[in-house]
Design a protein with these regions (language model features):
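Extracellular/periplasmic ligand-binding modules, especially the Venus flytrap/periplasmic-binding
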Residues: 313, 359-362, 408-468
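Electrostatic cytochrome c docking/interface patches
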Residues: 12-49, 92
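Gly/Gly-Pro-rich "capping" loops immediately C-terminal to redox-active cysteine motifs
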Residues: 38-100, 121-127
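Solvent-exposed, acidic/polar segments of extracytosolic/periplasmic ligand-binding ectodomains
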Residues: 470-515
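Beta-alpha junction/loop-to-helix N-cap segments that form part of ligand/metal-binding clefts
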Residues: 152-154, 169-176, 190-262, 333-338, ...
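Extracytoplasmic ligand/sensor domains, especially the bilobed periplasmic-binding protein
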Residues: 224-327, 377-401
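C-terminal capping alpha-helices of c-type cytochrome domains
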Residues: 15-21, 98-113, 120-148
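Extracellular/periplasmic periplasmic-binding protein-like sensory domains
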Residues: 368-440, 505-514
């Protein structure tokens, strides 16, 4: 399965005190004093508070201006105002570049640098010197917020996919499916008249090359507005940092390696639960259905700080719901004596084992346990369940449980047929369905978020739109819900039993939510 996280875009540094005050003035009309300065409107000079007529109302939160009601407010980002060759407006009004003094006169007296009167729709604001300085500082900052990859007629969406090597078939299938999906959206008029365009960066086995390839996609030409279904196996944490630093939203399937740093994933919206969340689902199952005490459960975790944090998260989850703490054992590939580990766990009275991390194959662990004639309940998050899980020693029959973030039963019949038709349109006859289903659902979520962000598209509006999504039905996955702190849409999973005799999975009960 293609697993991913991430994003990118120009850096949006934290606001300075002056920029923050300028933003408040620009968006709300409230000055440095905490009150609204006065504004005069129209030929009669009607006096109103600036809070009734903030700059953003006409020029937009991004400063670019949008035609409305027969009036076309200009782009007032500072780099536009100071263009050395000046400006020629639609009504043929001409003037040279603004400077600080010219800006003051335009805002307060309604005159451009050539002495021409501005449109009467433009209020004349009675701002003090500090308010003017703060406003000018924020207009400079708007350049940093400008959304790359967005034009009047297009939005460029990036992805990172393997196009060569053993994963090439999966990567090419995702690319073909996304291109076909975007073509459908565009044929229906796009999003607020903008066409969706896919920009593909090539994932390489080498992390440095992959990051470099992604950087070119983000920075070359128009760049990209957001990332969709990126493949980031092996360097998720680094790409998550890139996403946050560049202030760009990302819609990703599922993260394999957890990132336990506070607010690390502020811009990454995962569709499905990963290994840590699914381990919590299994922990609940062990306690509620298998009726085990916390002390009966042992977490066998892979080595590494990410898995230390994951084990702490699962332990804390168990402790909130019951008495005592589960056991924890560290597995180091090539160093740990599994037979000795199994013997000690049995001697300690462990009745259930939750595997946490991809270093330890469940079949290898089960073989070591069987050599000790020990058959505990074996609980495996889906991302860590190898194909050999069906071939465990017979003593484990009825004792192996796997948690998955979604099942085929989540698929609405009509949506599934529509999805299959899209694959046919794209010429995809062999496909890793789990990967493509997640990418298709991600594209549906992306389009919904773009619609919610509105015509004045910005990364900030996109993130806010995603955070407000509640119970979104893609038709192929469990409902997706986000908020200001939640970055996993379908937070929970299904538990399935492994029938070793018949070599099949048997779902046990409904979706298990972690809300």
């Amino acid at each position: 399965m293609l697993l991913g996280v991430l994003a990118a875009g120009p850096s949006a540094a934290a606001l300075s005190a002056e920029e923050a005050a300028g933003r408040r003035l620009y968006e709300t009309g409230i000055g440095v004093s905490g009150e609204a300065p006065q504004a005069r409107v129209g030929s009669g000079g009607l006096a109103l508070p600036a809070s009734a007529l903030p700059c953003a109302n006409c020029h937009g939160r991004d400063g670019r201006g949008r035609p409305e009601g027969g009036v076309t407010p200009p782009d007032i980002r500072w780099s536009e105002l100071i263009k050395p060759y000046g400006h020629v407006h639609e009504n043929r009004r001409r003037h040279g570049p603004f400077d600080a003094d010219g800006f003051r006169i335009a805002v307060g007296d309604g005159l451009d640098p050539a002495g021409n009167r501005l449109d009467q729709a433009m209020p004349r604001y009675l701002f003090g010197a500090r308010d003017l300085d703060n406003l000018r500082a924020y207009l400079r900052h708007l350049e940093k917020r400008a959304a790359r990859g967005v034009g009047d007629m297009h939005v460029q969406i990036g992805t990172l996919l393997p196009l060569r090597g053993p994963l090439a078939d999966a990567g090419k299938a995702v690319r073909g499916m996304l291109e076909a999906y975007f073509a459908r959206v565009n044929a229906a008029g796009g999003i607020y008249g903008r066409r969706l365009e896919l920009v593909v960066a090539e994932y390489a086995n080498d992390a440095e090359r992959s990051v470099d390839n992604l950087g070119h996609a983000l920075d070359d030409g128009d760049g990209v507005f957001a990332l969709l279904s990126p493949f980031a196996a092996g360097f998720e944490r680094r790409l998550t940092d890139l996403a946050k630093a560049r202030d760009l939203p990302v819609v990703a399937p599922v993260v394999l390696v957890p990132d336990n740093r506070p607010a690390a994933n502020s811009h990454v919206f995962h569709l499905l639960s990963g290994g840590t969340e699914l381990a919590r689902v299994l922990a609940d199952y062990a306690r509620a259905t298998l009726e085990l005490d916390n002390r009966d459960i042992v977490l066998v975790q892979s080595a590494g700080s990410a898995w230390d944090g994951a084990a702490q998260d699962v332990s804390a989850h168990l402790e909130r719901g019951g008495d005592g703490s589960p056991g924890r054992t560290l597995f180091r590939r090539g160093l740990t004596d599994l037979d000795g580990m199994a013997a000690k766990l049995e001697a300690d009275g462990a009745k259930a084992v939750i595997l946490l991390g991809g270093d330890l194959d469940p079949a290898v662990f089960a073989a070591a346990a069987a050599r000790n004639d020990w058959y505990p309940e074996l609980l495996v998050p889906g991302p860590f369940a190898s194909q050999d899980v069906m071939a465990l020693p017979p003593g484990f029959d009825g004792k192996v449980f796997v948690a998955y973030p979604s099942l085929p039963t989540d698929r609405d019949k009509a949506t599934w047929q529509d999805y299959l038709a899209l694959l046919a349109e794209a010429g995809i006859d062999r496909a890793p369905h789990a990967t493509l289903v997640a990418s298709y659902a991600g594209a549906e979520l992306l389009v919904e978020a773009l619609k919610r962000a509105g015509r004045e598209l910005s990364r900030e509006a996109m993130v806010l739109g995603l955070e407000k999504i509640q119970g979104f039905e893609s038709g192929l996955l469990p409902p997706l819900t986000y908020n200001t702190t939640r970055r996993v849409g379908a937070l929970g999973g299904y538990v399935v039993a492994v029938d070793l005799a018949k070599r099949v999975y048997r779902p046990i009960g409904p979706w298990r939510s972690l809300d």
